[in-house]
Amino acid sequence: MTTPNGMPDNPGDPENTDPEATSADRAEQAAEEAAARQAEESPFGQASEEEISPELEAEINDLLSDVDPDLDGDGEVSAVETQLAERTEDLQRVTAEYANYRRRTERERQGIIDTARAGVVTQLLPLLDDLDLAEQHGDLNEGPLKSLSDKLINILGGLKVESFGEIGEAFDPEIHEAVQDLSQGDVKVLGTVLRKGYRLGDRVIRTAMVLIGDPEES
């Protein structure tokens, strides 16, 4: 039953309600309620400019106060260049220190090796002296001693050990031990070699024992 304006007498009566319109209204209402609940549950949905905590606002102000309003692009570039120069200088210093460390370590390592080699050669000196005497008497021309002498000389050469002290060499008090000076002039040479000297590189293992004489006239 309807009124003169076309509206039903009782709009809420199920008989006067459009089922499709009612379903649409309920769905829209349910969506609005769900959106409202989600906004209430979300921490971001409740935030506003007036709800910022005093602690957060104070922290923001502190950060803003650290910004230099007079800093321009040129100032930033200059600061970066200064810092880059300082870091480059630090890198160069560290590189130089490392290079010096490596050189020092290498010298120490080589010194240890040379000391060990010198110790081995020192123990072989009596054998070397016997072989020199055998050579002077002609016993090293052939036979087992010749083979032994050649092998020992090769070993010493591999260790960079060399002998010195030959007749006619200029006398050097740093490496020659003079038993007697038979020279009559100012120029002194080795007249007789009583015992050869040996050195390892620049290190003298043993000085040569010699008699000083005059150089032979040519």
UniProtKB/Swiss-Prot annotation:
Q: Where do the record's region annotations for Disordered lie? A: 1-75
**What is the protein's quaternary organization?**
Homodimer.
Per the entry, what this protein does is: Participates actively in the response to hyperosmotic and heat shock by preventing the aggregation of stress-denatured proteins, in association with DnaK and GrpE. It is the nucleotide exchange factor for DnaK and may function as a thermosensor. Unfolded proteins bind initially to DnaJ; upon interaction with the DnaJ-bound protein, DnaK hydrolyzes its bound ATP, resulting in the formation of a stable complex. GrpE releases ADP from DnaK; ATP binding to DnaK triggers the release of the substrate protein, thus completing the reaction cycle.
Question: Basic and acidic residues: which segments have biased composition?
Answer: 23-40
Entries under Gene3D superfamilies matching the protein: 3.90.20.20, Head domain of nucleotide exchange factor GrpE
Which domain of life does the protein's organism represent? Bacteria
Q: Which family does it belong to?
A: Belongs to the GrpE family.
- Write out the annotated subcellular location: Cytoplasm
Q: Which terms are listed as keywords in the entry?
A: Chaperone, Cytoplasm, Stress response
Can you name the source organism?
Corynebacterium glutamicum (strain ATCC 13032 / DSM 20300 / JCM 1318 / BCRC 11384 / CCUG 27702 / LMG 3730 / NBRC 12168 / NCIMB 10025 / NRRL B-2784 / 534)
Q: According to the UniProt entry, which residue ranges have a biased composition of type Acidic residues?
A: 48-75
InterPro entries named in the record: GrpE, GrpE_coiled_coil, GrpE_head
Q: Where does the UniProt entry say this protein principally localizes?
A: cytoplasm
Q: What is this protein called?
A: Protein GrpE
The entry's cellular-component GO terms read:
cytoplasm
- Which HAMAP family does its entry note? GrpE (MF_01151)
Q: Which GO terms describe its molecular function?
A: adenyl-nucleotide exchange factor activity; protein homodimerization activity; protein-folding chaperone binding; unfolded protein binding
Lineage, top ranks = Bacteria, Bacillati, Actinomycetota, Actinomycetes, Mycobacteriales
Q: Which GO terms describe its biological process?
A: protein folding
